[in-house]
């Protein structure tokens, strides 16, 4: 079965290098297509990643596997100490390897603007990727381009931009901009409605809005007042539309400018030269221009206020860092600004303090609340040698700790960076909406012109009036803004809410894939279980001494890195171990060596059988231990089986409850393990697993995932080790447990900040809720436009004899955007079912 593998390339410097790599890959019979750039390759075929990397190396370049579904958000990993789930739940990043830049944008009004700004940024030399977020009015740009070049590109496209250095400044400027924007929209709405409402009411109860010789001067004054309203309260619509026209584009502002402008120009023409129009066509529409501008500005104000609420989760994370830290020196303690704290400084924490930076405790004990980082509500006890993390709170106790990571290098900063990048990404469904939005405005203008022409040539008299009403109403009611906001608003709210539950999503596409899963595969060791195996029994045969058996087994395991080795060494921690010679690791079987003149074998039954050691006499004991969920580790001395060490890795305390939640949600649960089937089935029965794939060697995990996918299943893989990375990459969605290896986390689409399977259930529940919300928004926006535009074009006239008022169209347009934003904000209150 063909697959697409994403590779990160190194050593390429020009087009010739790209061509050489592409030709080398496509010469392989198992490669169907290779898309190569200077930095990456996307290869489709049946070849494995290892084979492709070897081919690239033979061509003279280097390559490594990157995330198959999305570009990794952190380009490098700096291994951290395995002290807490938090510290390892993110790949560390330095200021040098973070090539992303943030821009605050202004002047954008709909998805057409997004496409235009994104294309402008991606055309700048040095830009590898640009993500524009309409909901937050921001752009996240990857690459080596300078901030000045990026700002100039945006301004050339007709919009405003400001380069932002860090999250603190971004937040400050974004809040300033949001407050200023809301104030501006508010007074513009008040001014426009203050003129529009009285004129409309007067027209309804005191005048029929038809110009006559008696009221002509009064209407001329009203027309000039309306023009002033259009300039001062609606000028931004016309300026934006003009800039778009100069750049050969059309946006929502174009529709508003055309609709209100045509209505005013027609009314002023009737006002100045009434003799040119038949008596029945001398109707004025000044109030429509003022009311439409007022209602749309009011809608923008309410939308901006609702958008601010959508970033609530991320703002909570930003609020976690205190402004100062308590520095301990030889002269005593003093409070210093957070920006002055450097790695290596000694800091103090007492009850109630919020931790300012990451570090390691050197003295004292304390209970820390890490809920905002990990979603874990139970305070954690910390002592000397343990890690503490910026943003957590000391509930009780006092400690001294040495700063290890400050500023943008703290776990909290990396979480914020990951969340923000995920919020700026777009799923496939969102990209489809963007494509539609890109042609939406020109199509609406064409529909308005065609509808107006039909009414002009075939409509009732006075044709010019009906033509004007139809064209204006169609232009005003169409709402690309709702379409453009539908996806990003749901993503911002969903990703932010997930972060509150300790679930970090790499990108929006991962959320979409996670919402369609039907099978969840768990690695056993360290995922379903605690990852801390214990020797629960030692049974000897042929009168062999139990202590001697344990001593020899531990001696062999000194050279092994297997998790079971640690359990045996812990059991023999107080014993004097002999020197081992000729140590060998037999992959998937065990270890061998010589000690005190004896040939030793330690491993599974397959190892002893492979070395012609008879195990028939002890098969009953092996089966008995395996049926209880223990892993039988056999020791053979000089060709004879002399001992059985039963090693058991207990299930996590919340594994059963979490798996029950997943069962109720309709997922099929699969356990992937290298254990023998008897042991694996015993553990699966205890945990409530549906299917067991046992006896899988480390390099066979990805193949096991492939087999499940070939059955038509949508598969998530949950793991934490380096050997899980290929399976995490192969799965439709890889989920890395907090505390897992950096390689696993870098490969996974979703990272859990707490080492709990409840996080898996939470992640999948939030993914489903987010996609459901996204579909509701998109469906609502499509239905609104699909019904609104035909109604505005007069489709109901033959049946009801009525047309939609342009003012009602303006109100409906504003309401559609507010509805989308409000619906997305419901995700901020979402709680996964227990």
Curated annotation (Swiss-Prot):
Cu(+) 1 binds at residues 14, 17. One of its GO terms (cellular component) is plasma membrane. Cu(+) 2 binds at residues 110, 113. Mg(2+) binds at residues 720, 724. The chain crosses the membrane at residues 187-207, 218-238, 254-274, 284-304, 438-458, 464-484, 779-799, 801-821. GO terms for molecular function: ATP binding; ATP hydrolysis activity; copper ion binding; P-type divalent copper transporter activity; P-type monovalent copper transporter activity. Its EC number is 7.2.2.8. InterPro entries: ATPase_P-typ_cyto_dom_N, ATPase_P-typ_P_site, ATPase_P-typ_TM_dom_sf, ATPase_P-typ_transduc_dom_A_sf, HAD-like_sf, HAD_sf, Heavy-metal-associated_CS, HMA_dom. The active site is at residue 523. It is an enzyme of class 7 (translocase). It catalyses: Cu(+)(in) + ATP + H2O = Cu(+)(out) + ADP + phosphate + H(+). Keywords: ATP-binding, Cell inner membrane, Cell membrane, Copper, Copper transport, Cytoplasm, Ion transport, Magnesium, Membrane, Metal-binding, Nucleotide-binding, Phosphoprotein, Repeat, Translocase, Transmembrane, Transmembrane helix, Transport. GO terms for biological process: copper ion homeostasis; viral translational frameshifting. Residues 3-64, 99-162 form the HMA domain. The keyword Phosphoprotein applies. NCBIfam families: ATPase-IB1_Cu (TIGR01511), ATPase-IB_hvy (TIGR01525), ATPase_P-type (TIGR01494), PRK10671.1 (NF007952). PANTHER family: ATP7, ISOFORM B (PTHR43520), COPPER-EXPORTING P-TYPE ATPASE (PTHR43520:SF6). Belongs to the cation transport ATPase (P-type) (TC 3.A.3) family. Type IB subfamily. This is Copper-exporting P-type ATPase.
């Amino acid at each position: 079965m063909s697959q697409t593998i994403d590779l990160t390339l190194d050593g390429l410097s020009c087009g010739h290098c790209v061509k050489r790599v592409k030709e080398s890959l496509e010469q392989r019979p198992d490669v169907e297509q290779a898309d190569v750039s200077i930095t990456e390759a996307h290869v489709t075929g049946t070849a494995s990643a290892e084979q492709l990397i070897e081919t690239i190396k033979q061509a003279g370049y280097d390559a490594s596997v990157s995330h198959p579904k999305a570009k990794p958000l952190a380009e490098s990993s700096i291994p951290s100490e395995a002290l807490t789930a938090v510290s390892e739940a993110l790949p560390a990043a330095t200021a040098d390897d973070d090539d992303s830049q943030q821009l605050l944008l202004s002047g954008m009004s709909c998805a057409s603007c997004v496409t235009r700004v994104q294309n402008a940024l991606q055309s700048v030399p040095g830009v590898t990727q640009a993500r524009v977020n309409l909901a937050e009015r921001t752009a996240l740009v990857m690459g080596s381009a300078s901030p000045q070049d990026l700002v100039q590109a945006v301004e050339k496209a007709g919009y405003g931009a400001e380069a932002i250095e860090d999250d603190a400044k971004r937040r400050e400027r974004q809040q300033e901009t949001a407050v200023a924007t809301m104030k501006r929209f508010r007074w513009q709405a008040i001014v426009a409605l203050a003129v529009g409402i009285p004129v409309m009411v007067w027209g309804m109860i005191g005048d029929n809005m038809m110009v006559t010789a008696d009221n002509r001067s009064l209407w001329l004054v009203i027309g000039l007042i309306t023009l002033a309203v259009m300039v001062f309260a609606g000028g931004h619509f016309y300026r934006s539309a003009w800039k778009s026209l100069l750049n050969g584009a059309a946006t929502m502002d174009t529709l508003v400018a055309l609709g209100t402008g045509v209505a005013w120009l027609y009314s002023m023409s009737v006002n100045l030269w009434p003799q040119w129009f038949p008596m029945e066509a001398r109707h004025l529409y000044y109030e429509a221009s003022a009311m439409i501008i007022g209602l749309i500005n009011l809608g923008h104000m309410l939308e901006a206020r609702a958008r601010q609420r959508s970033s609530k989760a991320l703002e909570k994370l930003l609020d976690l860092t205190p402004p100062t830290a308590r520095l301990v020196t030889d002269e005593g303690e003093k409070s210093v600004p957070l920006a002055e704290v450097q790695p290596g400084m000694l800091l103090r924490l007492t009850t109630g303090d919020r931790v300012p930076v990451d570090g390691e405790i050197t003295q004292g004990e304390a209970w820390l609340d890490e809920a905002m980082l990990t979603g874990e509500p139970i305070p954690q006890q910390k002592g000397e040698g343990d890690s503490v993390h910026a943003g957590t709170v000391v509930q009780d106790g006092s400690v001294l700790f040495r700063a290890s990571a400050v500023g943008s290098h703290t776990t909290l900063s990396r979480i914020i960076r990951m969340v923000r990048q995920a919020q700026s990404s777009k799923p496939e469904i969102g990209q489809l909406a963007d494509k539609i939005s890109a042609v939406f405005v020109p199509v609406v203008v064409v529909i308005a012109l065609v509808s107006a022409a039909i009414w002009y040539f075939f409509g009732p008299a006075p044709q010019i009036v009906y033509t004007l009403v139809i064209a204006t109403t169609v232009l005003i009611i169409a709402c690309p803004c709702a379409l453009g906001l539908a996806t990003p608003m749901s993503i911002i709210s969903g990703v932010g809410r997930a972060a509150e539950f300790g679930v970090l999503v790499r990108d929006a596409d991962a959320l979409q894939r996670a919402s369609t899963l039907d099978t969840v595969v768990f690695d056993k060791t360290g995922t379903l279980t605690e990852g801390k195996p214990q020797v629960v029994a030692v049974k000897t045969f042929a009168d062999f001494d139990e202590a001697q058996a344990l001593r020899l087994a531990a001696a062999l395991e000194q050279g092994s890195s297997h998790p079971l080795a640690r359990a045996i060494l812990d059991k023999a921690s107080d014993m004097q171990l002999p020197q081992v010679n000729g140590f060998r690791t037999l992959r998937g079987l065990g270890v061998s060596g010589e000690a005190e003149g004896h040939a030793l074998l330690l491993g599974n039954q397959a190892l002893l059988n492979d070395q012609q050691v008879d195990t028939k006499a002890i098969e009953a004991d092996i089966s008995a231990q395996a049926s209880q969920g223990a892993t039988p580790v056999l020791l053979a001395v000089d060709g004879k089986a002399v001992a059985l060490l039963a090693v058991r890795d207990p299930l996590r305390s919340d594994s059963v409850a979490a798996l029950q939640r997943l069962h109720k949600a309709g997922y099929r649960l699969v356990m992937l393990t290298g254990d023998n089937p008897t042991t694996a089935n015993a553990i699966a029965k205890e945990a409530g697993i549906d299917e067991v794939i046992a006896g899988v060697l480390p390099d066979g995990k990805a193949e096991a995932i492939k087999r499940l996918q070939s059955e038509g299943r949508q598969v998530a893989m949950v793991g934490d080790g380096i050997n899980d990375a290929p399976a995490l990459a192969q799965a439709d969605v890889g989920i890395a447990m907090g505390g897992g290896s950096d390689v696993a986390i870098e490969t996974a689409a979703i990272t859990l900040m707490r080492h709990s399977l409840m996080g898996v259930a939470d992640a999948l529940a939030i993914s489903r809720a987010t996609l459901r919300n996204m579909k509701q928004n998109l469906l609502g926006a499509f239905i609104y436009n699909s019904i609104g535009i035909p109604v505005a074009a007069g489709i109901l006239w033959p049946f009801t004899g009525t047309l939609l008022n342009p003012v009602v169209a303006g109100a409906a347009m504003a309401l559609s955007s507010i509805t989308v934003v409000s619906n997305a904000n419901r995700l901020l209150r979402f709680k996964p079912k227990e």
